[in-house]
């Protein structure tokens, strides 16, 4: 096909951007158009004509525009693919095609007539290429090797937090005690609209944990301040998003009587925590606490060492970065800033360029050292970090199956961490022993 088109270089900034103008030979274009129309004529069924017997003029009238559009797409795809393949440009990140002009196909000729008239098919191909990245020199890197100094106070604090998590409701015996937020209240209540009892509106021994949002907020709010044995009546409004359609937007009169109140009480003794979580003994509880603290310590220390490495790579290596990838990264960062309610302060473009550069360096590292990921790597990553996404492990796994963009994002993060761990394993270390307080302070100052 090379003889059927001419290519003119429009832009080559000696970096990553390329632009070329393609001019397609008119005789070639019209010969292909005639062939396309003849193909249509042989196969199309037109009322009143046997297959293949409709005149070419009728075929042109009905199918010329579609035939031209299909032909232009095919010629652009074939010529640009051939040019890129023969040009040995390396990895192309993004490409864009814009048609500048096309022949006046209304004046086109058949293969038996004279020269075609009008403009040539001319289009512009723009693309960016992946830069040549240097291989990271591992012998030049020194990173911190942070060892945890877990103290008895850390273990005690962890166990105290466990006690709060396994709090239990204790029945209130004080007749003057008034319901507070977080209390569990057992009530009898009746619901009426215009004096008529609602279906299921006469309920006994309903347990409500005030503030959980499992009943209407107006109902919860009215319970606050009530005592055991107290009764009261009040109106409520069913909201527009209420689950029972015929009650949406309606008002009801509620009568409620508090029968019992339970207040939340934290477990105070270690032996109760041991019993609640079914530990063998107190030493097993402390070992569990130490292990969990160590896991969190390792997670934070990895984040700190990762930043050390990224800062070093950003300072040491300078490469051109593709503008199209930087633009996408800018959009991601702006979304992150929006999600954080503006609490993140950052030079968006500089941060985007840094992220793209680091990504290119790490990809080069992964390819050179044949580093790849598998399902176990992905699950291990999710199991470690799923709480960072604010949803359950099962929800993350479901998103991984159903959301391609999320799956690609996770795969990218897993590969990034695997390459970083590979680098950390091989570079020189500066050993440091730190307490959890020192480590958290360092994290805050990152």
Curated annotation (Swiss-Prot):
<keyword id="KW-0131">Cell cycle</keyword>
<dbReference type="Pfam" id="PF05697">
    <property type="entry name" value="Trigger_N"/>
</dbReference>
<dbReference type="InterPro" id="IPR001179">
    <property type="entry name" value="PPIase_FKBP_dom"/>
</dbReference>
<keyword id="KW-0132">Cell division</keyword>
<dbReference type="GO" id="GO:0003755">
    <property type="term" value="F:peptidyl-prolyl cis-trans isomerase activity"/>
</dbReference>
<dbReference type="GO" id="GO:0005737">
    <property type="term" value="C:cytoplasm"/>
</dbReference>
<dbReference type="GO" id="GO:0006457">
    <property type="term" value="P:protein folding"/>
</dbReference>
<keyword id="KW-0697">Rotamase</keyword>
<feature type="domain" description="PPIase FKBP-type">
    <location>
        <begin position="182"/>
        <end position="267"/>
    </location>
</feature>
<keyword id="KW-0143">Chaperone</keyword>
<keyword id="KW-0963">Cytoplasm</keyword>
<comment type="similarity">
    <text>Belongs to the FKBP-type PPIase family. Tig subfamily.</text>
</comment>
<dbReference type="InterPro" id="IPR037041">
    <property type="entry name" value="Trigger_fac_C_sf"/>
</dbReference>
<dbReference type="InterPro" id="IPR027304">
    <property type="entry name" value="Trigger_fact/SurA_dom_sf"/>
</dbReference>
<dbReference type="Pfam" id="PF00254">
    <property type="entry name" value="FKBP_C"/>
</dbReference>
<protein>
    <recommendedName>
        <fullName>Trigger factor</fullName>
        <ecNumber>5.2.1.8</ecNumber>
    </recommendedName>
</protein>
<dbReference type="GO" id="GO:0051301">
    <property type="term" value="P:cell division"/>
</dbReference>
<keyword id="KW-0413">Isomerase</keyword>
<dbReference type="InterPro" id="IPR036611">
    <property type="entry name" value="Trigger_fac_ribosome-bd_sf"/>
</dbReference>
<dbReference type="InterPro" id="IPR005215">
    <property type="entry name" value="Trig_fac"/>
</dbReference>
<dbReference type="Pfam" id="PF05698">
    <property type="entry name" value="Trigger_C"/>
</dbReference>
<comment type="function">
    <text>Involved in protein export. Acts as a chaperone by maintaining the newly synthesized protein in an open conformation. Functions as a peptidyl-prolyl cis-trans isomerase.</text>
</comment>
<dbReference type="InterPro" id="IPR046357">
    <property type="entry name" value="PPIase_dom_sf"/>
</dbReference>
<dbReference type="GO" id="GO:0015031">
    <property type="term" value="P:protein transport"/>
</dbReference>
<dbReference type="InterPro" id="IPR008880">
    <property type="entry name" value="Trigger_fac_C"/>
</dbReference>
<dbReference type="InterPro" id="IPR008881">
    <property type="entry name" value="Trigger_fac_ribosome-bd_bac"/>
</dbReference>
């Amino acid at each position: 096909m090379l003889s059927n088109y001419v290519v003119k270089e429009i832009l080559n900034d000696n970096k990553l951007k390329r632009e070329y103008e393609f001019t397609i030979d008119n005789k070639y274009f019209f010969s292909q158009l005639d062939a396309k129309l003849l193909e249509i004529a042989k196969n199309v069924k037109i009322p009143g004509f046997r297959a293949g017997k409709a005149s070419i003029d009728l075929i042109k009238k009905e199918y010329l525009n579609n035939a031209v559009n299909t032909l232009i797409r095919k010629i652009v795809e074939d010529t640009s693919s051939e040019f890129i393949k023969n040009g040995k440009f390396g990895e192309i990140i993004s490409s864009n095609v814009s048609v500048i002009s096309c022949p006046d196909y209304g004046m086109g000729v058949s293969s038996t007539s004279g020269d075609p008239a009008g403009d040539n098919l001319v289009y512009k191909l723009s693309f960016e290429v992946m830069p040549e990245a240097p291989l990271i020199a591992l012998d030049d890197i020194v990173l911190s090797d942070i060892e945890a100094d877990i103290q008895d106070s850390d273990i005690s604090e962890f166990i105290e937090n466990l006690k709060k998590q396994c709090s239990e409701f204790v029945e209130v015996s004080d007749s003057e005690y008034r319901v507070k937020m977080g209390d569990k209240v057992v009530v009898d209540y009746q619901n009426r609209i215009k004096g008529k009892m609602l279906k299921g509106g006469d309920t006994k021994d309903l347990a409500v944990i005030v503030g959980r949002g499992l009943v209407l907020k107006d109902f919860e709010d009215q319970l606050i301040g009530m005592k055991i044995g107290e009764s009261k009546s009040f109106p409520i409004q069913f909201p527009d998003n209420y689950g029972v359609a015929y009650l949406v937007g309606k008002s009801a009169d509620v009568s409620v009587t508090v029968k019992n109140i339970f207040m939340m009480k934290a477990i105070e003794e270690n032996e109760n925590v041991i019993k609640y979580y079914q530990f063998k003994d107190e030493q097993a509880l402390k070992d569990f606490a130490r292990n969990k603290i160590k896991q969190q310590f390792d997670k934070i220390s990895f984040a700190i060492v990762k930043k050390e490495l990224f800062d070093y790579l950003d300072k040491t290596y300078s490469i051109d970065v593709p503008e199209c990838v930087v633009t996408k990264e800018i959009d991601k960062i702006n979304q992150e800033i929006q999600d954080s309610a503006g609490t993140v302060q950052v030079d968006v473009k500089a941060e985007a360029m840094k992220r793209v550069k680091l990504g290119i360096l790490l990809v080069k590292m992964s390819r050179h050292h044949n580093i790849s990921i598998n399902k176990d790597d992905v699950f291990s990553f999710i199991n470690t970090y799923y709480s960072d996404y604010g949803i359950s492990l099962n929800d993350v796994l479901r998103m991984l199956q159903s959301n391609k963009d999320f799956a690609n994002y996770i795969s990218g993060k897993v590969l990034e961490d695997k390459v970083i761990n590979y680098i950390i394993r091989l570079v020189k270390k500066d050993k440091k022993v730190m307490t959890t307080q020192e480590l958290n302070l360092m994290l805050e100052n990152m």
